[in-house]
C-alpha cells in the first residue's frame, strides 16, 4: 500500500475521497503501477514533513492545527516504527525545510526567512541553529532564500517556502560525486506576459542561488539543473515553478515528477497559444533532465495552472510518506 497525503481545497466535491475536518486526507494508491516505489522517500510539503534520521529511522513532523488525528493514527498503523512530532514552532513548515540525510555529509536546506522570523521574535541565530540541529540530527545547515524571493514569490504566505524553487534529487549514477538539485530559472521566454524590471530582479536572485549552490557551500558539491519558472501574469502573482516537483531516487536510479502547467480545455485562441508555448518549454525541459542522467521524467496533469494561482503545485499538494512493495 502507498499512502499519499493530499492537501485539497475545501468544497472540492470529490465524493470518493474521505473528507476529514481539515483539508488533509489519505488516499491509497496501487503500487503495482509504480515499479520503483519502495522504501521511505523524503518529500517535503507544508503540513507534513517526513525524513529519515541519522540512524535510518523514519520521522514525521506535522502541523497540529491542520492534520487530523485520524491521519496520524492511520500512519502509525501503516508504518511501524515511525516517530511523530508536532512542529515546535509556527515559523517552521515543510515548505521551508528540506533534509537530505542519505548524503555522505547530511545537510538541511532551511529557508532564510526562518532565521529572520525567529530573529524578529528575539531569538539569536545560534539558538535557531542549535534547535534545528537537535530537531533533525543534522549538523550542516544551508540557508537559501532572500527578501527578493519573499516579495515576488510568496505574497500569500507568511514565510517564504523554498520548495517553490528548489528540489533536491540526491546522487545520480552518472555523477555520484555530486548532490544534484533542481533550481528554478526565469527567462524572457518563460515570463509569458512580458519581461519587466521586477522579473529581471527575480531572475537575478534565482541565478545567484544557483551560483551559490555550485560554489560548494559547506563543502557540499552540488550540480545544479535549471528548470523553468513560468510567470502567467504581468504582476508576478500567478507563478508556476517546475522546481516545485518531487523526486524518487533509489540506488541512483532517479525519476522526477513535475507539475504540468498547460491550461485546461476549452480555451480561447490566446490561451491556446499560451498552452502551446508552455508545452514546448516543458518538452525541452524533459530532454534537459534526461540528458542530466534522470531515468524518467513525468509531467503530472492535475490542473496545476489553476492551482498555481493559489501558490500551489505538485510539491505543495502531494507527498509520498512511505512505500511498500
Where do the protein language model's features map onto the residues?
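Histidine/cysteine-enriched polar flanking segments
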Residues: 1-325
Amino acid at each position: 500500500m502507498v499512502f499519499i497525503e493530499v492537501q485539497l481545497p475545501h468544497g472540492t466535491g470529490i465524493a470518493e475521497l474521505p473528507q476529514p475536518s481539515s483539508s488533509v486526507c489519505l488516499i491509497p494508491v496501487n503500487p503495482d503501477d509504480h515499479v520503483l516505489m519502495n522504501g521511505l522517500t523524503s518529500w517535503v510539503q507544508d503540513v507534513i514533513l517526513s525524513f529519515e534520521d541519522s540512524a535510518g529511522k523514519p520521522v514525521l513532523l506535522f502541523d497540529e492545527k491542520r492534520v487530523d488525528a485520524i491521519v496520524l493514527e492511520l500512519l502509525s498503523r501503516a508504518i511501524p516504527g515511525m516517530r511523530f512530532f508536532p512542529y515546535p514552532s509556527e515559523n517552521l513548515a515543510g515548505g521551508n525545510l528540506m533534509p537530505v540525510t542519505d548524503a555522505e555529509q547530511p545537510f538541511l536546506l532551511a529557508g532564510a526567512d526562518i532565521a529572520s522570523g525567529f530573529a524578529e521574535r528575539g531569538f539569536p541565530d545560534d539558538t535557531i541553529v542549535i534547535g534545528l540541529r537537535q530537531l533533525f540530527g543534522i549538523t550542516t545547515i544551508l540557508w537559501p532564500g532572500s527578501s527578493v524571493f519573499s516579495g515576488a514569490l510568496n505574497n500569500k504566505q507568511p514565510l517564504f517556502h523554498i520548495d517553490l524553487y528548489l528540489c533536491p534529487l540526491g546522487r545520480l549514477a552518472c555523477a555520484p560525486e555530486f548532490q544534484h538539485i533542481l533550481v528554478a530559472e526565469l527567462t524572457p521566454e518563460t515570463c509569458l506576459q512580458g519581461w519587466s524590471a521586477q522579473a529581471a530582479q527575480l531572475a537575478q536572485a534565482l541565478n545567484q542561488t544557483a551560483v551559490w549552490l555550485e560554489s560548494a557551500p559547506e563543502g557540499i558539491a552540488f550540480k545544479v539543473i535549471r528548470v523553468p519558472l513560468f510567470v502567467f501574469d504581468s504582476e508576478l502573482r500567478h507563478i508556476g515553478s517546475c522546481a516545485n516537483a518531487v523526486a524518487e531516487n533509489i540506488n541512483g536510479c532517479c525519476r522526477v515528477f513535475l507539475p504540468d502547467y498547460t491550461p485546461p480545455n476549452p480555451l480561447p485562441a490566446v490561451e491556446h497559444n499560451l498552452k502551446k508555448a508552455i508545452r514546448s518549454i516543458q518538452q525541452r525541459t524533459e530532454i534537459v533532465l534526461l540528458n542530466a542522467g534522470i531515468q524518467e521524467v513525468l509531467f503530472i496533469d492535475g490542473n496545476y495552472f489553476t492551482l498555481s494561482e493559489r501558490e500551489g503545485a505538485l510539491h505543495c499538494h502531494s507527498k509520498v510518506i512511505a512505500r511498500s512493495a
